[in-house]
Amino acid sequence: MTRIKINARRIFSLLIPFFFFTSVHAEQTAAPATPVTVEAKNETFAPQHPDQYLSWKATSEQSERVDALAEDPRLVILWAGYPFSRDYNKPRGHAFAVTDVRETLRTGAPKNAEDGPLPMACWSCKSPDVARLIQKDGEDGYFHGKWARGGPEIVNNLGCADCHNTASPEFAKGKPELTLSRPYAARAMEAIGKPFEKAGRFDQQSMVCGQCHVEYYFDGKNKAVKFPWDDGMKVENMEQYYDKIAFSDWTNSLSKTPMLKAQHPEYETWTAGIHGKNNVTCIDCHMPKVQNAEGKLYTDHKIGNPFDNFAQTCANCHTQDKAALQKVVAERKQSINDLKIKVEDQLVHAHFEAKAALDAGATEAEMKPIQDDIRHAQWRWDLAIASHGIHMHAPEEGLRMLGTAMDKAADARTKLARLLATKGITHEIQIPDISTKEKAQQAIGLNMEQIKAEKQDFIKTVIPQWEEQARKNGLLSQ
């Protein structure tokens, strides 16, 4: 059994990531009375913090794009009617934050600032320009409008001012000066009894990452970011919260179920696991202390896999060698993936069977308990797998969530079988060929050729205009 020596690990972290995603409370502020002090151009701080800057810049080496839909075409069906069915890649280095949100098919191909499918909030975990705009315009001013409105303004990749108070004298002296640059994140931490200003250094390290690596949703007319933590951080607590406010991200185009889309709940799952319970922070594992050429220690800002720096991360707490721990992690990952696939198979059938019931004349009242089960099953599945490190952060919680998802999906299918029988349908509902991403997308009626062509035109014509405008306004150095 893995043994963690908590006292062995306090040799880490000074400066913290230039990254991490987004979310929380939707009470927005008016335009600020204070001047804008956020400097979003990351290279500004290279002379003060050269080692940290160069290691942050090295996240550009994490450039591989992995197509999650091609790996698992079932996802296309589960997200039918939602932009994720078009395009979903596994995360790359933080140096690609702005590029990837611009180029994903999910953000569409807007032609002007009022065009496109998504709100401004979709920028919120991509750039220190977000913190700059919130300081400049207030939260109401920032969140207002469509995603395309932010194109000429949000141009610098996740960096220094996302996690540090770069305007402070302490930061200039080389101290980390951690900060929550997103006010909605600060409110969320307060909601769970963790006000940032009163937190210790190790708590603050993970809270800074938790500005973005969390579950969130878009609330109100302005689609402002909010974390669903009012009733707690467990999957059932958030499910209860969403049900209470009758929130849904979209309606599945097959089953007509009002669905929830989990984001990237690393903070929640880390909190539920052995590392979180012992306050082994994100920084301890993903941003260890390393030596520069002169032998000086600094915090490595090339956020990555702990096994890449085994001696500076895992070995500070664990007695096992690298190969032994890699074997443990691989086994946990395989166990979670095996159950994940089984849940997905059940959900795919449930969506198509629900469609068959609707086509056969099932009423809204007849479908409601079935759709509730589908909604809850997929939510629990999604929260378990949307956190890419669940097998390390909280494998037991991941398996528990997937187990309850399987139960809910089975309940939905049992009810569907009974309902279909009342409509005279007793044969098995056939599933179309979804063996590839392309076939699955065709099965839900996506015209991918048109979608891709429109996106390529957007990339060639609109993005260069955004960058030109940003340079004219002094928001980009080059």
Curated annotation (Swiss-Prot):
Quick one: which residues bind heme c 4?
A: 282, 285-286, 393
Q: Which residues bind substrate per the record?
A: 216, 264
Q: What gene is this protein translated from?
A: nrfA
Q: Where does heme bind?
A: 122, 125-126
Recorded protein name is Cytochrome c-552
PROSITE patterns attached to this UniProt entry = MULTIHEME_CYTC
Q: What is its EC number?
A: 1.7.2.2
Annotated NCBIfam families: cyto_c552_HCOOH, PRK11125.1
Q: Catalysed reaction(s)?
A: 6 Fe(III)-[cytochrome c] + NH4(+) + 2 H2O = 6 Fe(II)-[cytochrome c] + nitrite + 8 H(+)
Q: Where is heme c 3 annotated to bind?
A: 94, 209, 212-213
Q: According to the record, how does the cofactor bind?
A: Binds 1 Ca(2+) ion per monomer. Binds 5 heme c groups covalently per monomer.
